[in-house]
């Protein structure tokens, strides 16, 4: 029966699919995320010690002591965490200011309520340190007893005592550092005493003891020192502890950084404890009991080590504060002020890189075969192959530990040695101590070195994590094989000799070892083995088959004892249960065989042959790392842990409450991340996510080790802020990079070459590795999976929109000449968008542009509006047209005020052309377009406005022309017609050109002297002329753009050019071949075959429109002229009907006569310092007059009856040159001739368009027939 699923449920199920992580090819440039699977801890802390019934009883008892001491160490660590993470509560509690304060009881009660649990913890801490000191001293006393001094003490036991010494040093330093602990206890004590909470003497005494304990510095150390000195021979045991630490440190018998630093701290603090009233370390050194010169070398090499968190300790301080230092100062070199080369991380980078490359190469070889090919777990390998993988895993962990320790040691040294304004000029004198220790204490090279090492650590952690299952199998196989080979084969010979020589103690130890770890082939030890009887093997040899299993040592269950149970047959994590107990037992028993102390007169070592001793020592040394490697997952995490780079509780304590938390500028993870972003170093850009992983380390440590939620909350808050800043800066950088790339690509190559010739280099943006970052779809940070590409895409989309908006705003803040620059800004943004779309999903550029242009739903956008605004308020009234250059230039004398424009906002260079050099280069290029408006500008207007925008601008211009022609100009025409002479005949040639000039000057005196003629009248006509010219030039530019479009569209419409043919070739054959070649490009048949009906209709309409546009030759200027003609309906333009019924000859009632008068006026030459009409108004003035004349149909009359033309004809005949009425005749004639040529050009252009209109409007020619003229004599006769 099928289950019914609703549509809502189905849709919700589909939505859930988006949450499924899909595998992708994202480049790995971040550390591994924490596994969501649990990490089992199988450390039983020797709880299974009683299961090892075959072991030596003394060492089982010692394991019991180990167990209890480990528990105490864990408790001590908890108190160390408590002290380190202590934040002052008393500062947050209101203080009682006087005894008369009414709410003081309530304040004290709340104080006690809040602080009592914390003070209880402090009381427990005081009791714990007493108990720990007593326990440590009791162990020392037991081991230093006269009868036990020669007894064997295992290395594990000595190291556990060393860990106690380290614990005391840490706890004492933490107690000294935390003033807030003392303040909180004082506040509690004050409140409790007021409320009489501590009435009984015992409570008062305990409180007093706690006060003294917290107040006295080094109280734990002093108590420990005092109690140790009363123990006879304690210095001998401490010398053993120090020596084992020296030996371990010298032979690198440690794995994690914390183990390394613990060895050094135990050396220093141990020497301090040894040097006192009872013993003298210098005498012990003289007796060769300890080696101070070796310790001095270690301390000189590594002067500062981490103590706890961000607390550090100078190892030389232990030496300086010891009792006998002053008289032996000369023996120490570590106490001298010198910088160890260990802290110069930049010099160490060569070796680190070399180690990294060498190990990565070897690891890659195994990774390719084990992980990539998928053969790692399935294939069976030899012991040698397993051993190689085992060694590889160990070397990898040691390398990671070495690098992590190096980072922490440099960081610790920097914290102890903060910079100042004298060492670093960038460090202000008011900088805080933590700021001087972090923010200003690292050079750029050191920051890059830190980032590179961290990247190596985290990157190698990823690679080793991928091979963890392969390593686990190899480790278990190798350890199993090593243990079985050693127990079943290597120990046979010493067992045979011991049986033969009847060394009972040696036999018992060897048998205990074999019974503890042997996994016999048949389930039990071969009873016929000759070595058990002390006999030699037969001549053919005794065959011992040592099995091979992929398991580690497991715990022994007392209830089901069998040798095979020592090793869990199923392997896996079960195979690691109790490995610590087993390995402890085996190693301790082996150590007892080769130790110099045995508790008897003769050591067991002397009973063994030299080769056997060497074999045991070698195995004992190798097996040290077995415990770590069996838990490789945890070891890998510890070796890569850099969490302490964030913690700063010590420095917060130093601020005494002035700081709740430090800003991100002082935080090391952000300092390193921000340094990469600020320097834009290409080689470091792929490492930028690794410093952010330090927050993961710190958060993990805060939750799992410190177990403090407030620390995690602070880390989370800083991560939120830092990641926002990271995305913001990275997105801006990526946008700026691709914007600069686009600007460089589009920059004119010849311009770049010319700049280079003059020594000016315009650089290309250096190649950067942003592509890898843009592929990051799931960055892991504090347990969140972040789509970095999506966040950057959001920011870049906003930046892209802002860039387009800024380009348009920049155009809006300038005049019309800047439209060429606007187009190039948009082209650069278009190329930027195309480059970015290769790596991210952005909205289409056209959609972004329409949004920035406010043209999504409006019929026209900001660019169209500003073009019209500039035309109306600046271009029409203030520009002069020059027909020779085909350009408009700004007038010499403006008749209107400069329009007020908004200033462009100051933005970053990448919002313009990409960078400062590119901005300067493009500014120089486009400065050549700044001083005129010509064909480049009109073509740009056509491309940016399109048909719709051009139509809007034209419509608005026609409104302006209409208002001028029917308003201002019409009123002036009416006025000027009134002051014109009623009749002005053209004088006869006999008067001569001077007489004619004088005649016209006299007749037109009122027009010449009209005050507003050369200002308002000419200005209004200039605006009309400029509007007409703008429409004409837009028409021409649009035609060129259309032709370009048509040529581009031709191959897709099957419009092919005629081909050249040779003699004898047929044109049809060549054309058919060409058509066949371009047939796949023919769009309409293609869409008709493959498209939808809607697509077919669109394709056909587009094809038809393109062809019709090509064939019709549509003209917009004709329509403009026709519209302007409709504005000239007032009778004043044409005058009253002529009395002769034909035309006005001498009457000055038509516009062309008025224009003749105006032309006479501006043809009069001006003085030296005066501006001519063409300088003030340009050719637009003539275009306005001639256009009106043509549209009124008065051109021929104007050519016949124009005053200036008549004067020019006469002057050409008589050639006279006189000055009439201060007017040079010859100069005036020259000016008339120039304007005549201009007028003829204008008439020719206008007639070309008007004739087509007239031809289209009427096919019948209207001819008026007149009667022939009749002589007067005949007329009277008739």
From Swiss-Prot:
GO MF entry, a single one: small GTPase binding
Keywords assigned: Acetylation, Apoptosis, Cell adhesion, Cytoplasm, Disease variant, Epilepsy, Nucleus, Synapse, Synaptosome
Primary localization class, coarse: cytoplasm
GO biological process, one term: positive regulation of proteolysis
Superkingdom classification of source: Eukaryota
N6-acetyllysine modifications at: 1062
Family as reported in the entry's similarity comment: Belongs to the CYFIP family.
Subunit structure: Component of the WAVE1 complex composed of ABI2, CYFIP2, BRK1, NCKAP1 and WASF1/WAVE1. Interacts with FMR1, FXR1 and FXR2. Interacts with FMR1 isoform 6; the interaction occurs in a RNA-dependent manner. Interacts with RAC1 (activated form) which causes the complex to dissociate, releasing activated WASF1. The complex can also be activated by NCK1. Interacts with SHANK3; the interaction mediates the association of SHANK3 with the WAVE1 complex. Interacts with TMEM108 (via N-terminus); the interaction associates TMEM108 with the WAVE1 complex.
Stored PANTHER family: CYTOPLASMIC FMR1-INTERACTING PROTEIN-RELATED
Protein name: Cytoplasmic FMR1-interacting protein 2
Organism (species): Homo sapiens
Protein encoded by which gene: CYFIP2
